[in-house]
Structures are given as structure tokens and as C-alpha cells.
Amino acid sequence: MAEKRTVSPPAGTERRAKGWIQEAALRMLNNNLHPDVAERPDELIVYGGIGKAARNWECYEAIVDTLLRLENDETLLIQSGKPVAVFRTHPDAPRVLIANSNLVPAWATWDHFHELDKKGLIMYGQMTAGSWIYIGSQGIVQGTYETFAEVARQHFGGTLAGTITLTAGLGGMGGAQPLAVTMNGGVCLAIEVDPARIQRRIDTNYLDTMTDSLDAALEMAKQAKEEKKALSIGLVGNAAEVLPRLVEMGFVPDVLTDQTSAHDPLNGYIPAGLTLDEAAELRARDPKQYIARAKQSIAAHVRAMLAMQKQGAVTFDYGNNIRQVAKDEGVDDAFSFPGFVPAYIRPLFCEGKGPFRWVALSGDPEDIYKTDEVILREFSDNERLCHWIRMAQKRIKFQGLPARICWLGYGERAKFGKIINDMVAKGELKAPIVIGRDHLDSGSVASPNRETEGMKDGSDAIADWPILNALLNAVGGASWVSVHHGGGVGMGYSIHAGMVIVADGTKEAEKRLERVLTTDPGLGVVRHADAGYELAIRTAKEKGIDMPMLK
């Protein structure tokens, strides 16, 4: 049994650590494990199958103790969730450097990872779990909102009103889907095998209602579609069973996607025909049989998606590697539907835009509302962005420390960072602000089945870019920097980097913020310009980014 522990971040203006950066790292580590934030905090699991914040509780305690004693010119090294060393560096160096789940390519398989995991040698960090910047489902909801908004623009005249979106998976990431769809005016029918997860999304205002009856769910969805009413419905069921049944019934949704944890067949996907308890028993008793059955179920799931696509459903992969698993199981046409990045998001990446986020260390929601006003004032010409902030204020329930996310691009991030730092310096905000982002960003990830799928020059699998991103953020003075493997899509399919920087109101922080919040999105523009995207080339030239070989 997992050790029962409750972790929550300290808040307020008093710090226990020797500097605000160390204090911020401590609070954000604990925020990742807050019971309102983490999916399975007793097991240190934050989201995404087995994405963890620390390798085990002993490692967690050692990380906490070390952060409390860490000097302002020292750097703590984290190897797959374990604190392994402290070295004296300098005040502008990162206080923490993190490497999670990284395996030499020929060994980068789930089988080898699980062997090492059993020995206590490694940890799966997902993206923001092991890099201590997860903020609950809000962390993905604007990206999900933007994705569905682009679906609406491309296929439905700019709104999802009068449409049904069918999806599955209501975990930490997938839980954002119902709210994103209803924010775009549509009906969302979301299948989830675990009723507790559905209830959690209802409790946090991401989902409207739940049922265990397919007929009742369809009746509600069709009626709301007819009335052009926004509604989200959580259906208790297994997607590998429900989708084939819907195909038999002749039901075709308007939009179809999936956010189950198909990237990890052992820990993230329940095989068809099993209850949650039966699945847990089989997983422990015979993991190989479990994986085989889960993969067969994933294949059936994708075959049903393909059948619906042929009947007219706008279908896309939402970044969980479900197509690859199905293809490996013999579904030869699994890649007949596109991934969400090339279909809907890449133009934003070309401008250096991505899921920028910030957290109020004070714990006071008023600090976030004041920063919202900064966005509405300083970026008033960006109506999409302002619309998002206004909707977020009304619809987003904070999980753990108050936080906000919005997609800002090159130039915008640095401008925002300076304003926030000035507000901390003047006492307009009660405590420092943590600024970070998802690893899913314009220049920080190599993932051929997701963020870098179908690159114009064929450079999908080149992983130099996230490594350069991490190096650049470290020398620029980010507060903590991370390099992970396997986030989102599983072992062997991605390399990605994260950064977090603290606005503590000091002049030194102002300089670090200007450097990091310029170079971090700047590399995203460079990566896409180098691949030949005209929008990125134009952005690089307009912004004066120095690319020696740019024509």
C-alpha cells in the first residue's frame, strides 16, 4: 500500500529557505503533490499515468531538506527524482537542475524503464510533474481551448455550437477537454473508466454532469446539440468498449479525439472487459499479459476512431501516442488522422507562442487577479488572449496555489515578466511570482508523433533543439531547468526541456527574466525558421533574432 501522506505548499510572505528561488522550488514541489492538484499524491504521482514529482518519499524528504539549506550560490542536482549532489556555482545559475527518465536511445523502451524502476533507479517525470510546475488541469486548458477553437474555425464556421465532440480520458490532462469544448460553445461527451475522476472534474467545474448510461448520455448530447447549448457529459465506461458500440449504432460525432493515457499501456490504459479492481490485480500479477490486453484494446479503440473518421467525424490525435500503439498492433492505417500540433497549433509555435504560466507564491488569488489585469491592459489588442483571461476568471477553479496560464509569444513573455517583477518590487503583489511553462512549447521538445510531427524539412526526430533549449535557459539564469524523456507519448518517443524562473522583485531577477523570457521563446522561432516555416522566418526577421544562416 502507498504511504498515506498529505502534502500542501506553504503560502504567504515568510520563507523558510535561504532565498526566494529555493523557497519557490520547495513550494512548487509541494504544490505538485497537493491533494487538489495531484492525481495520486500518496504515490507521488502527479498526472499522466505515472508522472511523479519525486522518486520515492525518502527522496522527497531529502529534496525538501536540501532546498531548505541550499545557499544562494549553490545548485542542487536531481537525477530522476533523487537529489544526488549540491555544487557551488554562482547566484545567477539555476538553483536546481533536473534530469528525469533519460535513457540511451537503444535502451529507451518501457520494458527497460520498468526494470530500472523496480530497482529504484529511475522515475517517470512526464513533463511538468518531475519539473515541479504542474498547476492542475488549467495547465492544459487554454491550449485545449485554442485547439478546439481552431477546429471550429477550420470546420464549423468559428464555433462548436451545434456540434458534439466525442473523446475519452478525464485525467489531469484530458480533464481539460470538457471545459475547452463548452467554452467554444459545443457539446462534449467524454468517456472515462474511473468514476472518481469524472466526479473530480465536476467538483472543479470542468465538467457539467455524469452518467453510466450510454443511452442517457447520447440523449443528453443530441438534445443539447439540437438546442445549440454548451454541455459536457462524463460517461462512465471504457473507450475500447464504448467506441466500437457507437460505431455499431451508427453514431458519428462531429469532432473526435482522445486523451486516455495510451502512451503507457501498463499504467495508463484499462483493457476492455476488466473492472478497475480486476485491472489492478492483473497488472500486479501478470504485467506482460496486461500490456498485451491493453494494446489490443487500444487497437480496437483506434479502429473505431478510423471508422468514425470515414463517416465524416473531424478526427485528430491529441498527443498520447495512441496511433503508434495501434499501428504496432497491426492497425496499418492508424496514422490516417493527424496529430493536433500540425493540424491546429504549429502556426502559434512559429511565433514563439506556447503555454506560459505563472503562480502566486502568496497563495492569495488576488495576486493572480492583479496579473490578469496586466494582461488585459498590456495586450488589449489581442482579443483572443483577453477573451481567454475573462473566461478563465469566470470558469477556472484554482487547484493548489492560485495560478494562471495563457499563450504568450516572443517579446510578450519578457514584457510581462518585467511588469510582474516590478509589481513584486513595489509591494503590489504580496509575494514573488513563479513563471514557467509546459514542456510542450515551441522550441523545447522533439516528439515526432506530437509536437514535431510532420516538420516541413523532415526534422521531426532531431533532439538537439530541446537540449539547446535547456542549456540556453541554464546559462540565461532560469531558477530551475529540466530535461526529460518520454513525456506525453512514452518511452522512446520524445525528449523535452522545461524552465521555471522566479520574479522576486530584485534587479538581479529583472535581468534574468529579460534574458530567459527572450531566449526561451526565441529558440522556438529559430527552430521553426530553421525548418523552413515562412511565418517563423518572418517573425525572426521582424524581431531581429540573429540567425547566421537565415536567408
From Swiss-Prot:
Does the UniProt entry include the keyword Acyltransferase? no
Task: Give the cofactor note.
Answer: Binds 1 NAD(+) per subunit.
GO BP terms: namely: L-histidine catabolic process to glutamate and formamide; L-histidine catabolic process to glutamate and formate
**GO CC term (a single one):** cytoplasm
Q: Where is the active site?
A: C406
Question: What is the protein's major site of localization?
Answer: cytoplasm
Molecular function GO terms recorded: urocanate hydratase activity
The pathway is: Amino-acid degradation; L-histidine degradation into L-glutamate; N-formimidoyl-L-glutamate from L-histidine: step 2/3
UniProt record similarity statement: Belongs to the urocanase family.
This molecule's function is given as: Catalyzes the conversion of urocanate to 4-imidazolone-5-propionate.
Provide the protein name.
Urocanate hydratase
Q: Gene name on record?
A: hutU
